[in-house]
C-alpha cells in the first residue's frame, strides 16, 4: 500500500491518499476474493480511514470484516502483521480480551518480533492500573475523598442542569443518575456527574483515561477519545457526561482477573467541565500506530 505510506505535510492530501488506498485495495480484492493478503491490506486501509478521515463505526466494522476474510487464507493467517493490526483495532474498540489474544497470536507467529509483546504487556499494565485505581478510588485518602464528594455542586452541570439540554432546535431530556444505575450500552436521556480522582496512564496516550467518583462514592473509569494534545482534566474537576456509554469488562487473562466498568466518550465536546461545556478546540483526531514488520 505505497500510496498510504507516502509522507505528506498537508492533512487534506493525506486524506486523499488514504481514500485512494481504500479504493485500490477494494479493486485488488475484487480481482481475487480468496487472496488473504489483499483482504489484509484492505483491512489496514479501512483502519487508517477510520482514524484519519472519520471515526465512523461502520468503517471499523468493514475493517474487522476484511481481517476476518483474510484469516480464511492459510498464507495470510500466518502473517503476524494481520494479528498485530487487528489487535490495535480491538484495543480501540475496548474489546480488551480479544486484543490481548490477537497480540499473543502475533507473538506466536514471530517470536523474534518484540513489538507485539511490548504492546501486549503495555495493555496488560494499563488494565491492571484501571482495575487497581477503581478499587482504591484513585488512591485518594478518605478525608480528601469526602471533601471532594461534598464539593459536588449541581451548578457545575452547566447547560445540562435542569433536566434537559437544548442545542439549536433540538432538546434532549437528561435525568441525573448515580453511576451504579447505569446499564451496559448507551444510557439514553441519562446524565452522570462526578469528581476526577486520578488519571490513568496509557503508553499510547489514547484514550485519555481518568476515574470519577459520584455522590455515593462509586468510582468508575472514563475513557475519552479525540482529545487534543495538551488537553485533559485535573484531579478535583467536576465532570458531567450526558447519555454515557457503559462497558463492563469481566475476563481473565494470563493470571489476571479483570472486573470493572468504564464510560466511553467518543468526543470531548459533549463533556461539561466545572460548569462549562468543552469547545471544538478540545477535539483532535486519533493518530494510528499500525505496523508492517520489515523482513
Where are the predicted features?
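OB-fold/S1-family single-stranded nucleic acid-binding modules
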Residues: 242-294
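Short nucleic-acid-contacting surface segments enriched for D/E, G, S/T with interspersed K/R
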Residues: 226-242
Amino acid at each position: 500500500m505505497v500510496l498510504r505510506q507516502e509522507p505528506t505535510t498537508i492533512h487534506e492530501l493525506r486524506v486523499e491518499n488514504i481514500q485512494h488506498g481504500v479504493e485500490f485495495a477494494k479493486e485488488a480484492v475484487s480481482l481475487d476474493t480468496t487472496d488473504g493478503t489483499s483482504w489484509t491490506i484492505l483491512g489496514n486501509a479501512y483502519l487508517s480511514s477510520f482514524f484519519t478521515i472519520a471515526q465512523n463505526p461502520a468503517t471499523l466494522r468493514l475493517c474487522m470484516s476484511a481481517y476476518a476474510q483474510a484469516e480464511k487464507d492459510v498464507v495470510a493467517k500466518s502473517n503476524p502483521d494481520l494479528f498485530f493490526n487487528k489487535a490495535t483495532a480491538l484495543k480501540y474498540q475496548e474489546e480488551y480480551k480479544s486484543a490481548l489474544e490477537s497480540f499473543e497470536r502475533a507473538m506466536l507467529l514471530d517470536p523474534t518480533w518484540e513489538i507485539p509483546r511490548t504492546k501486549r504487556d503495555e495493555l496488560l499494565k494499563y488494565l491492571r492500573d484501571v482495575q487497581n485505581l477503581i478499587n482504591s478510588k484513585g488512591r485518594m485518602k478518605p478525608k480528601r475523598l469526602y471533601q471532594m464528594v461534598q464539593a459536588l455542586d449541581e451548578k457545575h452541570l452547566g447547560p445540562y442542569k435542569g433536566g434537559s439540554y437544548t442545542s439549536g432546535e433540538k432538546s434532549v431530556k437528561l435525568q441525573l443518575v448515580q453511576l451504579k444505575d447505569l446499564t451496559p450500552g448507551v444510557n439514553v436521556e441519562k446524565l452522570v456527574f462526578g469528581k476526577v480522582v486520578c488519571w490513568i496512564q496509557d503508553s499510547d496516550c489514547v484514550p485519555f483515561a481518568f476515574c470519577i467518583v459520584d455522590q455515593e462514592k462509586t468510582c468508575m473509569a472514563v475513557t475519552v477519545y479525540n482529545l487534543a494534545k495538551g488537553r485533559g482534566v485535573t484531579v478535583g474537576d467536576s465532570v458531567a457526561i450526558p447519555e454515557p456509554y457503559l462497558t463492563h469488562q469481566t475476563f481473565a487473562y494470563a493470571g489476571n482477573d479483570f472486573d470493572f466498568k468504564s464510560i466511553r466518550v467518543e468526543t470531548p465536546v459533549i463533556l461539561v467541565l466545572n460548569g462549562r461545556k468543552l469547545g471544538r478546540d478540545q477535539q483532535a483526531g486519533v493518530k494510528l500506530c499500525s505496523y508492517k514488520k520489515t523482513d
